[in-house]
Amino acid sequence: LDPESIKKQFDINALSPLCMTRSLINLFNKKSKIAFITSRMGSIDDNTSGSSYGYRMSKVALSMAAKSLSIDLIKKEIFVGILHPGLVSTRMTGFTNNGISTKESAKGLLERIDSLNESNSGKFLHANGETLPW
């Protein structure tokens, strides 16, 4: 374990998106949508492989911040997406053959963002539309 690396991941993946959103919040209008790209690796219920402590902890923290924001902002009719991009074939995943392309992931994420509304704001959603476990 490298505590400095974990702190850096937390700052980048959880704290920075929250701080940026709070700084910009007065610019959002009714029916605005805010998307947070988190990860299924931040799901406590779905963790079957362990490891990746810093990444997992930072992503679950981001999901919690986004969930809290969704509750705080619903009365202003601002909707919050908590989104997993899918297993994307990138350097981070070792360009896995099991992954989807960045284009396919982006398409799914945009569809989820477009469909954000009062009923699904604050839900943990996969780019393919599946609701994910916390």
Regions found by a protein language model. Name each.
Residues T21, S58, T90, S121:
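Ser/Thr-centric signal marking residues that sit
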Residues I37-S39, P85-G86, G129:
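Short, well-ordered beta-to-alpha junction loops that form the rim of enzyme active sites
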Residues S43-D46, H84-T96:
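Short beta-loop-alpha junction of Rossmann-like oxidoreductase domains
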Residues A35, K76-G81, K123:
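Rossmann-like NAD(H)/NADP(H) cofactor-binding core
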